[in-house]
Amino acid sequence: MAVDKGFKKIPGSYKYKIASEPWEFEAIHNLNYKTFVEEIPQHKKCLDRKLIDKFHGENRYLICVHGEILLGMIALRDRRPLSLDLKIGNLEAYLPPFKSILEYRLLAIKEEYRNSSVFAGLMKMAFNTALRKGYDVAVISGTTRKARLYGHLGFKPFGPFVGGHGAIFQPMYIDITSAFEFKKNSRVLTG
């Protein structure tokens, strides 16, 4: 994998895609470790500094890369039970009626790219995927530090907080039709 020392942020050179290459999955495991072990203490440390998600085989990873450098990712999963089902139980009790549900998981962006277009590009791709595949509702466990940002995208909080030990998350949902309307009117997610 390429080393990104001295890389300049050039938005036109970002590529958004579904992860498919071995190096991309390796980079995903490394970014998961950095984000969800070192930064947000959700999992225990390990010597190989990799975190392979327990639903890895079922996840569809949407990624942003520059060459062979992973800048950010989000995982999509629709197989029940969702991780939020396991954390709070009966999701249907908290959500408006829906026919199909998608979970956005493991949103992670390299620290030096968090104030770039990477987040918006990943969310645009996630919304487009949900709309194209016919999902009614998407859910996410958003870190409480970024709950306001998710709110600006149209996500609504529901249910109790989940997590613990310095990693508190707010379950949130978005009606996919609303997300599409928001996307049409958003300067951030258009283009």
Feature roles, as predicted:
Residues 1, 91-96, 114-118, 137-139:
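Short, functional N-terminal and low-complexity linear motifs
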Residues 1-40, 49-58, 69-70, 74, ...:
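Terminal substrate-recognition subdomain of acyl/acetyltransferases
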Residues 45-47:
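Long, charged, glycine-rich C-terminal linkers/tails
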Residues 61-65:
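Cytosolic beta-strand hydrophobic patch enriched in CBS
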Residues 70-114, 163, 191:
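Conserved acyl-donor/pantetheine-binding loop and adjacent beta-alpha core of acyl/acetyltransferases
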Residues 114-128:
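Conserved acetyl-CoA-binding loop-helix of GNAT-fold acetyltransferases
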